[in-house]
């Protein structure tokens, strides 16, 4: 109920603050949002690999990276991990991972991350390997070093408040300049599956801040698109690069939202008679699945309504598979067979139509997005050089 109320408030705020001005391409704010979903992150990883390949082709630049084109990249849970991988700099100040490196990452590390701990009372997985590999990959990099604005969510169980890690908020909240590996583990620490994460940050004046964090989906549901849009709104208002934008209109937003798949209509459904026999643990697992699916649907519905109301429906693309079945519905099945199935899901999704009313496939829509992103980047660079 509280989540729905928050959505409605943000929805009407968006409608109230938009205007009818036409957006210039170079003034558009570009946003990438990536859902949570555990090992199902393989699905958006396939989409990201295709999009980055298209950007490299359009710009004739094999070194082009997603972070070069998006003003804001946001993610929750496994989406937060993907966000960090494509925005964390290497020694050459370029993203340490190309999009094509993400699927191999899941295949190499997924079976070790989702290795049952054997605990009956504690979480299903101890999280030690996950934290170790995040430390190895992300090193000592902190939020302020990200190559573009990020929006990664978590929830503090001690203060009972959401925690949103962004670059643009560091001036007001320097304690949020945490290490990326701490942030990534925290946003992925789904209750039941992984232990909560405790860490401490220190500001330049010596102040000490303590965090006790769990999965970002607790704070922002599995689809962080609304969060990413709100961060983009603030960025457009505060960043000098967008000084020409006097009043933000959602016609000036270009949003790509990537899902990790939901169950088909006839899979994972239950009857009242069946559910009446469930115990607390079975209910907790089912409620998490139901809540994530419902919240993802409602987020897409709200955002679609806003963009349509502003006659900007082509500025929003939601890429989601709505017919997962069998093992592909599980967020923690990291068997090689299931990961291969998830790769197939992502590749097949590219060939599917965006909607029943449009013959355009996701592949074609992403090519269109790539062209827009490329053109905007060139216009922005040309404007900056004069």
Curated annotation (Swiss-Prot):
Residue numbers covered by motif GXSXG: 75-79
Annotated glycan sites: 115, 325
Catalytic residues (UniProt): 77 (nucleophile), 215 (proton acceptor)
Motif (DGA/G) on chain: 215-217
Enzyme Commission numbers on file: 3.1.1.-
Major location (coarse): other
Compartments, as annotated in UniProt: Vacuole
Domain of life the protein comes from: Eukaryota
PROSITE patterns assigned: PNPLA
Location of the motif GXGXXG: 36-41
Any Gene Ontology CC annotation: vacuole
EC primary class: hydrolase
Swiss-Prot/TrEMBL GO biological process terms: defense response; lipid catabolic process
Keywords: Glycoprotein, Hydrolase, Lipid degradation, Lipid metabolism, Plant defense, Signal, Storage protein, Vacuole
Misc remark: Patatin have a dual role as a somatic storage protein and as an enzyme involved in host resistance. This tuber protein represents approximately 40% of the total protein in mature tubers.
Protein name as annotated: Patatin-B2
């Amino acid at each position: 109920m509280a989540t729905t109320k928050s959505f409605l408030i943000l929805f009407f705020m968006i409608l109230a603050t938009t205007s009818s001005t036409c957006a210039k391409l170079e003034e558009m704010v570009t946003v990438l949002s990536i859902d949570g979903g555990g090992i199902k992150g393989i699905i958006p990883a396939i989409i990201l690999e295709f999009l980055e390949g298209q950007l490299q082709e359009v710009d004739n630049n094999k070194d082009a990276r997603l972070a070069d084109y998006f003003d804001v990249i946001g993610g929750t849970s496994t989406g937060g991990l993907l966000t960090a991988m494509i925005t964390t700099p290497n020694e050459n100040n370029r993203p340490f991972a190309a999009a094509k490196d993400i699927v191999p990452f899941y295949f190499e590390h997924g079976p070790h991350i989702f290795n049952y701990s054997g605990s009956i009372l504690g979480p299903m997985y101890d999280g030690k390997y996950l934290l170790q590999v995040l430390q190895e990959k992300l090193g000592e990099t902190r939020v302020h070093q990200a190559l573009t604005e990020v929006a990664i969510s978590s929830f503090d169980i001690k203060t009972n408040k959401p925690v949103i890690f962004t670059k643009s908020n560091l001036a007001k909240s320097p304690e949020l300049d945490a290490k990326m590996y701490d942030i990534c583990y925290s946003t992925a620490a789904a209750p039941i599956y992984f232990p909560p994460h405790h860490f401490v940050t220190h500001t330049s004046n010596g102040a000490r801040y303590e965090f006790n964090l769990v999965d970002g989906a607790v704070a922002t549901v599995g689809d962080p698109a609304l969060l990413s849009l709100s961060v983009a709104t603030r960025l457009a208002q505060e960043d000098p690069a967008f000084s020409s934008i006097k009043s933000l209109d959602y016609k000036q937003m270009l949003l790509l939202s990537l899902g990790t798949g939901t169950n088909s209509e006839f899979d994972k459904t239950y009857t009242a008679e069946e559910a009446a026999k469930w115990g607390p643990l079975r209910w907790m697992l089912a409620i998490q699945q139901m809540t994530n699916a419902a919240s993802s649907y409602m987020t897409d519905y709200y955002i679609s309504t806003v963009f349509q109301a502003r006659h900007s429906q082509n500025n929003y693309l939601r890429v989601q598979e709505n017919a997962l079945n069998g093992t592909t519905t599980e967020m923690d099945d990291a068997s090689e067979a299931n990961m291969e199935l998830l790769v197939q899901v992502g590749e097949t999704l590219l060939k599917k139509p965006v909607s029943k009313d449009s013959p355009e496939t996701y592949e074609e829509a992403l090519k269109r997005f790539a062209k827009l992103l490329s053109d905007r980047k060139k216009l922005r660079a040309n404007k900056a050089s004069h």
